[in-house]
Amino acid sequence: FDRPYGLFTHPVNKIKTSGGSGEYLPWEFPMSYWLEQHGYDVSYISNVDTHADPAGLLRAKGFISVGHDEYWSQQMYQNAIKARDAGVSLAFFGGNSVLCVVPMEPSSAGVPNRCIRREGWFLPMPENISEAARKMRIKRVLNESDFELNMGPDGALLMGGRLDSENGRGMGVGDWTCAIPDHWLFAGTGMKKGDSIKNLLGWEWHGAPAMSLPGMQVVAEGDATINQKKVGHYTATVYDGPRDNVVFNAATIWWANGLSSPPGHKNPSRHGVAQKGPDERVQQITHN
C-alpha cells in the first residue's frame, strides 16, 4: 500500500468526503475531533503500529478502533488480545471490524510491512467447504500463486461480537436501542429500555455476541434493515477484561458521527437512511 490514500469509493456518501484521506475524514476525524475538544489525552497509531509494536499498545489505558476497521493481520489480533489481558481497555467504535485476515509482507525493496493481501477471515472455518473454495488464486506482481485460506480466530472473542449476516456482508441500517438502562454505560443519558438513538446503526454492524466471555452483557440490540427489510440482528456489548478493564463494542460504523460534525463534515447515508449527526446520548455514553 505505497499509495494508501485515495477517494473513499464505497457509495456511503453521495458527496464523497474522504478528500484523499482514505477513510480518516469520514470516520476517524469526528472521533478525534470530539476527543481533543473534550481534553482527552490521546495518541494516534496506525494498523501497522498495532501489528509491529505490541509494546506500544501498553503505553495507554485504552485502545480505540474507529469506523470501518475491517482488515487485520493475525499479529494485530494477538497483540490486541495481549493488551487486553495486560489490563488495557478496548473500545470498538465501529462495525464489520476485525473481519479479513491480511498478512503484512515486505515490499520488493525489502521494506517491512508494506504489502498486504486478503487471505481469509476472523471467523470459524465453514464445516462444509469444497477444496476449490479453500484456495484462492491471486495475481501478485507478475506471478500467480495459490494459497490456502488463512482463517484467524473468531473476531467475537476479541471484540465481543462480529459480523453476523446471512449474506456475509454485514450491511444494514437501523436505530440503536437500549437494552440494559441501569448499566453504567447509560449513566446520565436518561435512556430507558427500548429507547433508541435514531439511525445510529449503519452502514455495517456487529452481532453474534460471544456470551461465553466473562461478564458479557448485550447493552443495545435490534434489527438491521435494508429498504425496511430485516437483514440481521445487531448487538452492542460490554465484557470484562481480567484486570478491571473492559471491552466495549458499539456495533456500528456510524458511532463517531454521533459525536461530532467537524467543519466540512458530511453525515453519512446508506440504503436511503441518513445518520442524524451528533447526539448528546452518544456523547455521554462515550464519556462513560
Q: For each predicted feature, which ranges?
A:
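Conserved anion/nucleotide-ligand pocket segment
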Residues: 134-191
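Solvent-exposed loop/turn segments at secondary-structure junctions
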Residues: 49-52, 68-72, 96-100, 106, ...
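Aromatic-Pro/Gly-enriched surface loop or interdomain linker
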Residues: 1-56
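Extracellular ligand-binding/catalytic regions of CAZymes and related secreted enzymes
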Residues: 1-18, 38, 102-118, 168-288
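Acidic, Ser/Thr-rich peripheral helices and adjacent loops at domain boundaries
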Residues: 108-139
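Loop/turn elements at helix/coil->beta-strand transitions in domains of secreted/extracellular proteins
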Residues: 37-43, 58-62, 85-90, 214-215, ...
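The substrate-binding groove and active-site-proximal loops of carbohydrate-active enzymes
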Residues: 14-24, 59-73, 271-279
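Short alpha-beta junction capping motif
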Residues: 57-105
